[in-house]
């Protein structure tokens, strides 16, 4: 990336090898199958295929920032069961000096937006800051506070 600061001076900036991602492990401790139902990207995207999770099973997926972007890894992933949707949100910042990592979950009749989960709108609980356990609607979750975050979800239904 080059920028011209004045007519005669050019400066070159590099973003280095900064990478943001979150790996999510979903443990299904219920007697219901969790059917993969897509995602809503805010920054970055799924780097792996989202798969169904059988009762007693575990699913894993990876969300990465967009290549070369000075942005974090942020989005919502959805699982459907019966007439409900499990929405899982994680937000891993690009700049740890300005922002924190956050996570949230919600079981509802619709796919929850990132805004609702991040801000605690429309009946969603307030998000949980990384490094703390959150619990909502029979779902426990924990997000580590590092650039390559681990998002652990235990769904009990």
Curated annotation (Swiss-Prot):
SUPFAM superfamilies: Cytolysin/lectin
Region forming the signal peptide: 1-14
Pfam families for this protein: Anemone_cytotox
Alphabetical UniProt keywords: Cytolysis, Hemolysis, Membrane, Nematocyst, Secreted, Signal, Target cell membrane, Target membrane, Toxin, Transmembrane
Keyword RNA-binding among UniProt keywords: no
Cellular compartment(s): Nematocyst; Secreted; Target cell membrane
A cellular component term, taken from the record's GO annotations: nematocyst
GO biological process, one term: pore complex assembly
Motif (Cell attachment site): 129-131
GO molecular function: channel activity; toxin activity
Summary of the function given for this chain in its UniProt record: Pore-forming protein that forms hydrophilic pores and causes cytolysis. Compared to equinatoxin-2 (AC P61914), it reveals lower cytolysis activity (5-12-fold difference, tested on erythrocytes), a larger pore size (probably 2-3 nm) and different affinity to membrane lipids (100-fold lower affinity to sphingomyelin). Binds to the two sphingolipids, lysophosphatidic acid (LPA) and sphingosine-1-phosphate (S1P). Does not bind (or only weakly) to sulfatides (SFT).
Family named by the database record: Belongs to the actinoporin family. HALT subfamily.
Record remark on domains: Composed of a long N-terminal alpha-helix and a core region rich in beta-sheet structures. Before the pore formation, the alpha-helix binds the lipid membrane, partitions into the lipid-water interface and stabilizes the monomeric molecule on the membrane. Finally, it traverses the bilayer, thus forming the transmembrane pore.
Protein name: Hydra actinoporin-like toxin 3
Organism of provenance: Hydra vulgaris
